[in-house]
Every structure is written in structure tokens, then in C-alpha cells.
Amino acid sequence: MYNDHKLISSRPFATLQSGVNIEVKMKSKRQQKLYDHYKTVFGEEPIFSLKLKKNVLPTDMKPITTLVFKPTDEMPFWKLCTIGASDYLMPERDIGFGRKANRRNEYMMFISPDVDIRNPSDDEDAPTDWLSLNSLLWATAEYAFNEKDNITVSDTIDMGIDGKYCGAVLLLPEVFKTPKIVKCYVSEHKYISIFQVMPITRELLTKKLRKKVGGIYWLMEQFYTHDDDYKLISSKPFATL
């Protein structure tokens, strides 16, 4: 049901709030396709974007942008979506049964509508606590480049963070009624995978590890719960502060 998964330990995590500026223009054909893909899926333009400054990026890594989409009646939650992670072509990875993981990823995080998210460049009184969630999203997006690794759905990343969340698990974004969101085609046969980054607590990660082989299924079911026929029956896929 799930790919062969792995637990990943990341380099020490740093909050990147000071490395934020605003960027809207896309700089490549691939990035423009991603931008258009997000707009099509969400039915609107992002309300603002955040970009990692080059001085906080690993050497030779291209900048990563977060597009911020507001809650709507149809999708009543915040959507934070990356553009730029897929510029890195990940190494090949065998995921079993003769299959290989895709080699270009982008990432998205869904945040509760109760969280106050405003553009810090436009509003000097805007809260900044939500930027810690965006930093977790960026750290996930940086991981494959930093480690020269391939990450895919069901992987968990332990970032060694002190606080509410210690890392993240990669999920399929089942909150959407259509699976189209998970693939952005850049040509007829090539696509970018888009996975949901779900923050996890140290308690959840510890329980997952104790369950060993069945741990990843248990962990993923905490956010998207299925019946015996694997039909989605409930979901709690939103990050909170």
C-alpha cells in the first residue's frame, strides 16, 4: 500500500524568519508550470509569497519560494506551497516491486484557518509565529539537496527540533477530492511530485518507532483515517501552532 519508507535524521534545524523576502515572478518554464498548476487547483492567485534569501541557502542551491493561498469556502484552510525544490534532480531510488520514486518534488503544507497569517512585509503588526511552520516546510524542501537523497511519500524526517514539532512526515494530500494536485506535468511524460508536509511531534514519532514495521501506517492514519477497504473516513491534516 505504501512505498518502502525510511526514517531520516536531518541536520540541526534553524528558524529562517530573518531570511524572508517577497518574490512573485517565476524564473523558469518549470516554475511557471508549477505556479499555474497551483492556481488551477486552488482556483485563485496566491495572496503573497516568501522567498529564502541566498545567504541562508546551502551553497549552490537555488532559491525556494513559498506561495501562500488563503482559506476559501471550498478549501477552508491555508495552503503553503513551494516552488524551487524541484530544481534539484534527486538520485534514483528503488521503492519496491520494480518501481522507482520520482526524482523531482515540491511540497505543500495545510494550516488551520484559525492561525493568523499575514504578509510580514506589508503589515508591521503581523504575527510571525506562523513562520515557524513555513520554516519547517522549507527545511523539508532543502533536505534532498543537503543530503543528496531522494525522499518520497511516507518518509519521516526527524529534524531534531525543540518545540511542538520535531519533524515531518510526507503524505499524499487526500484532503483534495481529486488526485490531480500530486502531479504537475512539465512535459508529456515528465512530472513533478507534490507531497503534503505534515508536522509531527516527538511523541508521535516515538510511538511510530515503537510500532516498527507497522509504524508508518499507524502514523499516516493519524492524519488520514481509512476503513478496511481503504476508503477515507476522516481527516485531521492541518498544522496548528
Positions of PLM-derived features:
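Acidic, proline/glycine-rich low-complexity IDRs
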Residues: 2-82, 87-90, 98-103, 108-241
